[in-house]
Amino acid sequence: KVGCVVVGVDREIRSTGFNGFPRGISDDLERLSDREKKYPLICHAEENAIMHAARIGLSLKGCTAYVTWPPCTRCARSLIQAGVIEVVYPAGSEVPERWIPDFEMSTQMLDEAGLTIRKA
């Protein structure tokens, strides 16, 4: 349901990611349908895109991340540390109420770190 595409300065795709379990971890129905089991295992889309780039030795410094939702604080930290300079997500994204405080904090983090946040 959630994806991330990271593009370089020439708008070339540098990396992609989606919400899912780490390599080698079975994504069976029992785990996927139980939040208590799923959430500790899941890698967020932004994390997967960053880790994929790192795995193949590709820097994301100066890149733009296009994401399905505003990033959570966990992903905001990773985007900042990876050197991403802009985050773009759809305008009018309806964020579930339980995530609003986390998304507000992540927006503050991205802003304080000097990243551009754009709703498109």
Question: Over which residues does each language-model region extend?
Answer:
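Zinc-dependent deaminase catalytic domain
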Residues: 1-120
